[in-house]
Each structure stands twice: as structure tokens, then as C-alpha cells.
Amino acid sequence: MSAGPGWEPCTKRPRWGAAGTSAPTASDSRSFPGRQRRVLDPKDAPVQFRVPPSSPACVSGRAGPHRGNATSFVFKQKTITTWMDTKGPKTAESESKENNNTRIDSMMSSVQKDNFYPHKVEKLENVPQLNLDKSPTEKSSQYLNQQQTASVCKWQNEGKHAEQLLASEPPAGTPLPKQLSNANIGQSPHTDDHSDTDHEEDRDNQQFLTPIKLANTKPTVGDGQARSNCKCSGSRQSVKDCTGCQQEEVDVLPESPLSDVGAEDIGTGPKNDNKLTGQESSLGDSPPFEKESEPESPMDVDNSKNSCQDSEADEETSPVFDEQDDRSSQTANKLSSCQAREADGDLRKRYLTKGSEVRLHFQFEGENNAGTSDLNAKPSGNSSSLNVECRSSKQHGKRDSKITDHFMRISKSEDRRKEQCEVRHQRTERKIPKYIPPNLPPEKKWLGTPIEEMRKMPRCGIHLPSLRPSASHTVTVRVDLLRAGEVPKPFPTHYKDLWDNKHVKMPCSEQNLYPVEDENGERTAGSRWELIQTALLNKFTRPQNLKDAILKYNVAYSKKWDFTALVDFWDKVLEEAEAQHLYQSILPDMVKIALCLPNICTQPIPLLKQKMNHSVTMSQEQIASLLANAFFCTFPRRNAKMKSEYSSYPDINFNRLFEGRSSRKPEKLKTLFCYFRRVTEKKPTGLVTFTRQSLEDFPEWERCEKPLTRLHVTYEGTIEGNGRGMLQVDFANRFVGGGVTGAGLVQEEIRFLINPELIVSRLFTEVLDHNECLIITGTEQYSEYTGYAETYRWARSHEDGSEKDDWQRRCTEIVAIDALHFRRYLDQFVPEKVRRELNKAYCGFLRPGVPSENLSAVATGNWGCGAFGGDARLKALIQILAAAAAERDVVYFTFGDSELMRDIYSMHTFLTERKLDVGKVYKLLLRYYNEECRNCSTPGPDIKLYPFIYHAVESSAETTDMPGQKAGT
């Protein structure tokens, strides 16, 4: 097939090793494609046509001016059209030659196609996909059945010219990624020399591939204009195909695929744990998020990689799909509808009547068969009339898209797929009028109910009963001696040890043994606690002294643990006076409170395991002693990974905080040393309660008739700063705390740093299940900060003025709820995923047995967004519904996003004015999935969620006498 002026047809290449041929020499360009070789002038090249017989480009009447400037994404990510434009205007001779070649192509293809189908259909249906006869005609059809890109199809005819092109323009030097190579090439059996030669050409041609990574590529203005001028879109859906891949996708390490659940800090020094994460849920969510938290969107995302339990931000990126402009897609529809439908009609005659149908699968990076389109069912856009013709390189070879083409016969379920595609085609043609929400004052910083009118603790709370231990509540202090302003006394008076699988294994336990050598060199089991005491009581004057002390009772990790961050902080960050204060005052005080553990924490601490509804209340002094031991890495059985005893629990020892050269580590250490200085200088006097809540019964969301509650939404302020007295949401990881002891530094990690008493929950809280949450009441804020993730900076010490309740707990209630991680944008709209997120939020907001008037408002924000891939508007609606079901008001912080603030307020006002209850709104979410997302072949739906809801409710109101009565049904 002629590719236009200046293109040299491909000639047959002899097979190496065949009779009469020899292997290429060192100067032969076949073995060294990077070297330049002499290329004949294209005008002198013999005319030879090799056209795939089934190519739609060969249909009579399809030839046109586009054939000579088809775009291909494989040539150094530079379009062929762009390259040809640099050659100057076409001459009359070149245009004549192009038209002649085009006519010959059409004739050749028509003859071959007519000869091919009557004789080969039966063989194609009975022979495996790759075992095709290698006749010239069938060899052309081989490209339909092998997993090659549309561009490779064209290279079979243009190999030499590709080499000429690259000879004139030096290659970028980018290696060919494995994911771009054809897995089938070289695997199918070959029976003649022609096939061997062709596959050698395939391999040679693939050397010119330039990898295209959808994640980090952004379209240029020129590309966008070129694509908008392509007559490749017959419908809005097809325009989505053209432009959907322009959306930038970011790789995420959620705090972790490698994690601090899987994400190891990039700068963490010589070692990487690279521990895979298990955020994967029973619903099949991605493993890389096992032990990380997630960031608040739209703030910066932590791009460092961590290892076992980091926060979500360290997953480098999140897939974000921007909304497409309806008007631009409609314009493209008008330009291409006639041509696309005419071509598709011709194609249907040739494919449907002959019984050989071809299906093209588009698979964008990060998706699993998300975009499949049938040739016979969808006559619009990129998926119509383009599947196998080389011209598709212009329409599908966008530099922002990574496409894997699977050419295969349609299976027995073709009728069902054709029905779906026809419905999809009809759906994209319909026009949904936009409901325009009322204009809101642009200068407004908040909208909705004034925050002063929202319920807050302790004013709205019920009177607490006397604090008493019970079967479901462990209290580690003397409740009879509890006095305001006094340090609580531990209970019992003397240390009680339990070394079992239901309680925390304490460093001071008699069962915590360590192998030691006696005077005769024999190894015996000694007390590890005694070794810890001996090591820590040594004087620290240099960071190396602290490192040596920690490794004395962690010998197994002497060659694994890295203390670079600690050494750099001590030597390079601290001033001399600060370093002196650290090793003369703060560290000795920390050692003292750590070694007092058996006198402070006298009662065994129960593990909060899955499926438990249990609370643990302990004093702030006890928590300080436990955290000091965590700093010195004294907790046994908590360093092993994989299938160890505590593998389903977060890390607690601080060894990962000391590793690497990340700029985050000094700021984390500053924040934590501020806490230790404060609690060692003056003993805290409060209590903290940790409650694991596991629910079995959830609302039937379709039938929930509870009305929406009040909403205050603002783009200013923070949850911890402006949500005092409210239920404050921690955008948690399943392993609570995420990467706080590693490299994570987003919403959850920051909260755990400024309220360090939260960190002790990692000691005894097992990974959260889908129906569970962790509620922490009474923690104190010790630090103030600025920035986020990489820009986080410890600012100053903070004096927490929160009121205390009758149990001497500060009225700061924090709930840790973990959102799902979505690698594909559309997945979050699946009903099962929506229901899971509703249940998780409902579990965190519900307080069984407490009247609604005694429940404080929920202070939350963009939960599950950012690197977890959640849509902020969907997540806001989910939290509003869950709060309504739990009968709580909502205070929503958009973290600087004023547009999101207005959108959420407008939607909430729209729904409440029309008196839509929780069940009706939930049904609208189901409708949105079924009508817009289920059969969507692009990364994101054509119509966004909120416009769909506006239109659905308004349409329902027009068809009933009572507006809103049937909305959502």
C-alpha cells in the first residue's frame, strides 16, 4: 500500500543463514541498525505493493489526501505528518504520484480481498490464530491476527523509509520497552522462508520503536490541533477515544505499591525493603497499597518510594481524567459523521456477509480491557473503519496513547457485544442538556450552614458514665484515683506479664530472651531487657553511639538497618547547641522513660484484632514510655516481614525513620523530638482511648429514607485546625498510620506526627477490614507545621487548649477510615465499590445508641482522592450520604479548591431542595454507572457525575406532577 510521496516500498530481505546468503558483517546495517547506510532515492525504488487484503483503507472510494500523511506514533514520537511538512509543499508530480498509488492500492486491495474471503474464511475459522498459511495473500492477513499495533502493520511496507527517516534525524536513544514488543512475534510456527523473512523484518522494524508512556507524556498544542482536525470522530464517544488518552496519568507508589506498604523511600539509602503491599481487598483492589495512607487532594503528592507501610502519597501518582468539552466533540462529530457512516456501511457488507469479523482491543496503560470497541457495531470515531487499515496510525497513533491491538475473530458472543456497542453508539449520540446551578458569589470562602451552628464536643455530648474496665474495655490506670491535673496511676501496681498471641509482647517481658555467650563461649538464652538497659544507659555524644546501642540488641539487623537520616540530622541539620541539648538532655530523658516501662505499663495491652469491638484506655505517660521504646527499637517480633507473627500489624519500631537521605526525615525527627522534649520535661496528665469498631449490619442503601443533613463547605482551613470538637477524619491506610515511621508525609502521617500519641495505635491495631474503623479520643497536639509532603516543615511547639471530658480525655475525636485505591478511574463507580465506600464511611461515623443531637459534626475532606485515584465529587457525595445515614452534619474542607467547594454546595442544595433522601441519591449513583460507565470504552465517561444527576432529577421532575418524587428511580 502506498503511503504517499516520498515513501519507498518494502522489498524482500533474504533470510540470514539461508542458502546463498551469509550473516551480515559488522558494517551491515541489518545487524547494526544504529549505523547509517546508503539509501536509494525513493523515486528510483521499484514499485511493489503489499496491502493487507482486509484493510479498510483498500475499500474503493476511501483513498484521499490523508493517506499520504498518516500519523504514526512510533517514529521517535514525531508524527509523520510533521516530518513531511518540513519537506515543503507538495509538487504537482508528487500529488500525481500519490493519486496514482492510491488508485492502484484500491484496485489491488479489492482484487485481493475478493479472492481472499471466498477461499479462506473456512480456514480462518478452523485454524488457530497464529497458524496461518503463508501465501502472499494470507500473509497480509496475518497482521490482523497477531497482536501488532496499527503502525507495525504499516511498517511492513515502509521499513526502508523508516530507516531513511531515522538516518536523516538522529534517534533519541530511548530503548525499546518490552511492553511495546509483540509477544507473538517469533512464537508462531513458520514453514517457509517468506515467513521467516517477514518476522526478521518485524524484529528489525521494532528497533525503530520509541516507547510511549501515557503516564508522563503531555500533548503539545500542535498535536492537539492536529488531532482535532482529523476526521476520525463520528460521535462524542469517538472524540473521547481520540482525546481520552491525553489525560495525564501518574504512577503511584501508595505510600505505596511497594509500600511503605510497598513504597520504599527513593532516598532511603543503600537498602530497599521493597515489600509488596496488600491494599488489595476482598473486592480485588490493588496490592500495592497495603500499608500506606493517602494524601489530601489537591495538595502535592509524595513521590518517594517506601517500603512497608507508607502513605498513599508515595505512590507517585494517581490517574486523573479531565472532563472533555462537549462542544468540541460535537463539532468533530459533524465533520466526520458522513464519512464514518459511509465507510462503515461498506465495511459491514464485506465483513458481515463474508463471516470474518475483526475486533480491535484498545488497552490504555493502567487499564484492563477498559476500552474495547467492535468494528461492526460502532461506526464512529477511532474504532470505526480504522481497525486494520494502516491509515489508523494517524488516528490511533497519538503520542499520548499506548495502544495494544489484539486482532482476533469475534467469538460466539458477538451478538451480545454488538448489542452493547449499538446501545453505546446511541448513547453517545444523545445530547444531555446541562443544568446550570445558580451563580454563587466568587468571593465567598465558605458556603452552607455557618460552622458556629454545627454541633461540637463537649457541649453536644452526653454525660459519660464512670470509667470502668469491662470485657470490651481495657483500662490500664487506677480509675478510682483519677483526678484532673494529676498523672494517672498505673493499674495494677506491679508489672503483670502475658506472652501470648492476644497481647502485645513487651520488651521488658521475662520471655523476651536473647542468645548470649557466657565466659566459656557457650551460647545461652539471656534476658534481652537487661541487654537493652545496658546498651541504652551508655552516654551518647555522637550519633554513632546511639546507632551502636540500638544494634547491640538487634544484632540480626546490624548489616540491614541504615542510620543515614539520623546521622545527617545530628551532624548537618542541628546547630551545635541544639545537638548538645539533644544528647545531654532529651535523649537521656527518653532513655529514662523508656526503661521505666515495667513500672509505668504494668498491665498487658490487648491486641485489637479484626472482628473485635474493643477499647483500650491508657494514660499519656504510658503512651510516652511505649513510644520511647519504639524510638529505641526495643519491641520484639516486630521487625520481621512477610508471614511473621505481626505481619498483619503496622511497623512500630522507628528503624525505618532513621534510614535514607530524604529531605522529609529531618522534619519528621524535629516534630518527634519536640514531642519527647515536652513529655519528658512535664508529664502529661490525660487519658487516651483507642476503639476498634467492627460493624455487621449496614443500611440497605436503596431503601434508606433518611434525609440529607446540614453541610458547611469551605476551601480554607484544615480538619485539625478548624474542626475542633468534631469527629475528625483520618484519611487512613488499612495499616493505621501509613508511612509515619517511614517516608510517608501526607494527611495521615502529618496528623500522626503532630499528635504523636496516635502512633502507639500501630503497636496493637491489626490491619483494618472493610467493615472496620479505629476511633481515637483524647490525643494532644504538640506541634504546628507548614507545607505538605515534600514541603512539610516543622514550625513550632503547640499548646493544645482543647477541653477535657469527664474521663480526662481531650475532646479530640479522630476516626481512621481507609478508602479503596482505584487504578482505573471507572472502577470507583461500580456499585460494589460505591457500597464498600459507603459502608466504610458509615462505620466511621456511626455511634450505636447515641442520639443524633449528641453527635458532633463530621470534619472531613477529599478522602480517598489524590494518589488513591478517587473522584473528589463522588467521594464528597458518598460521605454526605454516609453522614446522613448516621444522622451527623458534615463540615467539608476542600483544601484550597474553591471550584470544588461551589460544586459540592450546589449539589447538596439541589438535592435537599428537591427532598431527595439517601436511597434516591444512591439509586442515581447506580443509574450513572449503568448508563454512563458500564459500557464506557474510554478512560472516563462522557458525562460527569454531577451534570448527570442534575439532568436525571430534572427530567424526572418534568414527568411527574410532584417534582422530585420519582427522582432517582
From Swiss-Prot:
The modification Phosphoserine is found at residues 135, 195, 256, 259, 281, 286, 293, 297, 311. It is an enzyme of class 3 (hydrolase). GO terms for cellular component: cytosol; nucleus. Substrate binds at residues 719-720, 733, 747, 788, 862-867. Interacts with PCNA. Interacts with NUDT5. Residues 1-449 are annotated as: A-domain. Keywords: Acetylation, DNA damage, Hydrolase, Nucleus, Phosphoprotein. The gene is Parg. GO terms for biological process: ATP generation from poly-ADP-D-ribose; carbohydrate metabolic process; detection of bacterium; DNA damage response; regulation of DNA repair. The modification Phosphothreonine is found at residues 137, 197. This is Poly(ADP-ribose) glycohydrolase. InterPro entries: PARG_cat_C, PARG_helical, Poly_GlycHdrlase. Signal peptide: none annotated. One of its GO terms (molecular function) is poly(ADP-ribose) glycohydrolase activity. The active site is at residues 730, 748-749. Its EC number is 3.2.1.143. It is found in: Nucleus. A motif (Nuclear localization signal) lies at residues 10-16.
